[in-house]
């Protein structure tokens, strides 16, 4: 698949609820969007490493620059035959997994488009749709969180992920599970704990969480 053109977009989107986690606060999300154009189709990819290097060493604008200045010139005008072939073209640059992932997902979409196949089937999926979940961060109060959970459930979300950090932990999850016992719920700690905290995690065993 010859890559004829690459178009890059650095985009931002305000969040409905501010996102507070163990590594900081955000009221918007930024991402890199990649549009690949080939002779027989086009593909779109995205990477969203946030707008500051708090979650990872990469951030959205840095990923945009990395693709524009270094990665895109390695593949424009070249025949990229597979995902593995794409990785070989980019192997000379260390790290930058978000920037590379944006190109990788766009290549898979381009390849599926050229073959007239939906992307979900091309990558081995078994269904054209998936259950959508909501992700809620630390809030001003448990009551505010419960209101937010009720709102996202009413909007059609069927799974829930909660941010979890010291001071916003077991009692918060207990309150959510009491109010919404049938809503599949995950928690995400973002590296805020160590092995010394295992006893606290055992306290979650009876809450029926889908995943930690």
Question: What residue ranges belong to the model's regions?
Answer:
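Metal-dependent enolase-superfamily TIM-barrel catalytic cores that perform enediolate-based chemistry
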Residues: 120-212
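Structured beta-strand/loop patches that form or line metal/cofactor-binding pockets in enzymes
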Residues: 1-55
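Metal- or metallocofactor-binding catalytic centers and their adjacent structured scaffolds
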Residues: 36-37, 41-114
């Amino acid at each position: 698949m010859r890559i004829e053109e690459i178009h890059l977009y650095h985009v931002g989107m305000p969040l409905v609820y501010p996102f507070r986690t163990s590594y900081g606060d955000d009221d918007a999300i930024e991402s890199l969007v990649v549009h690949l154009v080939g002779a027989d189709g086009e593909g779109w990819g995205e990477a969203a490493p946030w707008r500051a290097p708090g979650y990872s060493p990469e951030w959205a604008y840095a990923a945009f620059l990395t693709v524009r200045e270094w990665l895109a010139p390695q593949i424009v005008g070249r025949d990229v035959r597979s995902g593995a072939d794409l990785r070989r073209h980019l192997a000379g640059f260390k790290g930058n997994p978000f920037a590379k992932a944006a190109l990788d997902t766009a290549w898979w979409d381009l390849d599926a488009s050229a073959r007239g196949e939906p992307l979900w089937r091309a990558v081995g999926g078994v269904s054209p749709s998936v259950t959508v979940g909501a992700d809620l961060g630390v809030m001003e109060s448990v009551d505010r969180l419960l209101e937010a959970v009720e709102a996202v459930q009413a909007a059609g979300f069927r799974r829930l992920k909660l941010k979890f950090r010291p001071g916003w932990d077991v009692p918060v999850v207990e309150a959510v599970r009491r109010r919404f016992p049938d809503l599949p719920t995950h928690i995400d700690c973002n590296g805020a704990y160590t092995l010394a905290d295992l006893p606290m995690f055992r306290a979650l065993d009876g809450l029926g969480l889908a995943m930690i």
